[in-house]
Amino acid sequence: MRSDLDIAQAARLRPIRAVAADLGLTDDDIELYGRSIAKIDLGILQRLTDQPRGRYIVVTAITPTPLGEGKTTTTIGLGQALARLGKRSVVTIRQPSMGPTFGIKGGAAGGGYSQVLPMEQFNLHLTGDIHAIGAAHNLLAAMIDNHLHHGNQCGIDPYAIFWSRVVDISDRVLRNVVVGLGKKEDGPMRQTQFDITVASEVMAILALTTNLHDLRQRLGRIVAAYTRDGAPVTAEDLHAAGAMTVLLKEAIKPNLLQTLEGSPALVHCGPFANIAHGASSVLADMIGLHCADYVVTESGFGADIGFEKFCDIKCRASGLAPDAVVLVATVRALKAHSGRYTITAGRPLDPRLAEENPEDVADGAANLAAQVRIARLFGRPVVVAINRFPDDFPSEVEVIRQVARESGAFDVVESFVFAEGGAGGCDLARAAIQACEAPGTFTPLYPLDMSLREKIETLATKVYGATRVEYTPEASRRLAQFEHQGYGNLPICMAKTHLSISHDPKLRGAPSGYVFPIRDVRLAAGAGFIYPLAGDIRTMPGLPAHPAAERIDIDAEGRTRGLS
């Protein structure tokens, strides 16, 4: 089969005006970025206020291997399949960071015959939204140090500054840096760090905002530091929020692209799911739901992390609720969850993974059962999509089918969207349509008036399988501080590994009966959540020994080579 890049470059793209017209958008509603990309003016939401909303399908997954299990590919393929069935559909997905694109993971435009185009622009820069986010974030960082330099009227404690700087490249040497070296006029010297841009709270804010005024208010609420007396210092206190909003006035507009089969795709924002809430923007979903019969979106990683945050954070911010859930599973990942195989990104797969072994699938299927159970906690039907690989055996697929049904899945469907595009997802589309019409009421996992500890313990016991939570003294102090400062009604955004339902990436399958540790707790007041830290979570990745960047080049005709 041809590479993703070859397939993408061979495709004939529709004019983006024609794609916009499929959604009922006029030339007044879009701003062109070349022939194949446009931004959508937010005024469309006022014009379409009285339009009925379409159905809302969210795609999640079992706990993935480091290679991923095809969730984005399934999302795009399902959108294409719905269009083939005569439904007006749109997919809404995240814009990828260039860090993973140049590292091990590669791009995030889907795969095979279920991709978003133009693939090169999608993976690299797009319309510059991530750069605008980085500029807004770094403006606040610069104004903090400038405030210290010019007298520190707010009384900021230099040892209680929590606002780093960001760059959208994986660069491990920037994890710990010292700024202000040189003369006195070069600013105060202090230790700080760089994070990758998509880990910025500004990214999470942009993804959760509902309009420009809301964006301005959220940016003003960012707590960047504390005074020596322990009082929060906000971006509003530093008079930075207005300029930050101006830098984001174009980035707030969702980007319109198209799938390989020419159906609409909205690409907007890209917060990480292990650090932030891991979903594309509220605004893209709102526009899609007013313009289409079906919106297909995705949540990051497995149901335990991305889907839970989608429901408890994103849906609360948007006021929207999913009609159906599609949960992606693969034979390969469930074999890995048996504990008999190790899958490492950038290394050859164990050849035994390609051998027929339904017993290994059965031994790893506890993860599938747990993720279906987690997804069902929120009250909507779950369709399990078996993302088929060429070396899967019918006996192995049957194990997935049986376990999914026993776990309460609404339906179980094989998906071939990687190899066949929308045509390979029509059965999945029919199942998703039926699931949207099934009875059931969407319900978040916990009420916001619970204490922060109660919310954390609800997550740990009901979702992660732990028996109890253990807090470090620092974490306990932070929780008390945030409650005292009036942040106790915020939802929880757990920062934990995506490679296990637990906090420990080595615990595969469905861990249970363990203690869930919270080592620290942090506040994202602008985004509107509290994020406890469970385990070692890095906000600045590093590059592997042989990063994908080594294979990427361009020929004399301007065609990109080696991008995946």
UniProtKB/Swiss-Prot annotation:
E.C. code? 6.3.4.3
Sorted alphabetically, the keyword list is: ATP-binding, Ligase, Nucleotide-binding, One-carbon metabolism
Positions that bind ATP: T65, P66, L67, G68, E69, G70, K71, T72
An example GO biological process term is: tetrahydrofolate interconversion
Q: Record's superkingdom?
A: Bacteria
Q: Which residues form a coiled coil?
A: none
Q: Which InterPro entries match?
A: Formate_THF_ligase (IPR000559), Formate_THF_ligase_CS (IPR020628), P-loop_NTPase (IPR027417)
Q: Which reaction does it catalyse?
A: (6S)-5,6,7,8-tetrahydrofolate + formate + ATP = (6R)-10-formyltetrahydrofolate + ADP + phosphate
Q: Name one Pfam family in it.
A: FTHFS
Any one GO molecular function term: formate-tetrahydrofolate ligase activity
Specify the pathway: One-carbon metabolism; tetrahydrofolate interconversion
Gene3D superfamilies the UniProt entry points to? Domain 2, N(10)-formyltetrahydrofolate synthetase, Formyltetrahydrofolate synthetase, domain 3, P-loop containing nucleotide triphosphate hydrolases
Matching HAMAP family: FTHFS (MF_01543)
Instruction: State the family named in the UniProt similarity comment for this chain.
Output: Belongs to the formate--tetrahydrofolate ligase family.
| Protein name in the entry | Formate--tetrahydrofolate ligase
- Native source organism of the sequence: Roseiflexus castenholzii (strain DSM 13941 / HLO8)
